[in-house]
Amino acid sequence: NDNVEPTVTSASDQTTTFIQTISPTAIEISKTYDLYASVLLAQAILESSSGQSDLSKAPNYNLFGIKGEYKGKSVQMPTLEDDGKGNMTQIQAPFRAYPNYSASLYDYAELVSSQKYASVWKSNTSSYKDATAALTGLYATDTAYASKLNQIIETYSLDAYDK
């Protein structure tokens, strides 16, 4: 099968540096918003390619691929959308543009603090794996989303940030 995506099995220096950059804010947010820092970090790594995607770099700083506007600012980017029948089509869509990583992290936390995401909150789960399972189909349509996040958490020992 040529369509199998590679899994992260060994840590990269680029990702380790990215974690060091955003982890202080992620820890602060996780305590304030009842979230797992490990899941927040893993999602940022996965969604932004460790801060290397065009959307996550300056001047956009969008770490989570959140569409729409942030304080009136957005950037048009190509994205693949599923038509509901499994057919992927590339479209141009507006994505939120942030002044920095911190704003992106806090905006994401605000998004998942809505009741829709209650199944992701630390107080409603027994482990980060419950939270990653809840995000699958809720935040992302990718059926392998939880396993991808769990693999990142394990590879980089991100659960240490949940203590």
Regions found by a protein language model. Give the residues of each.
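Catalytic cores of secreted/periplasmic lytic hydrolases that degrade extracellular macromolecules
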Residues: 1-163
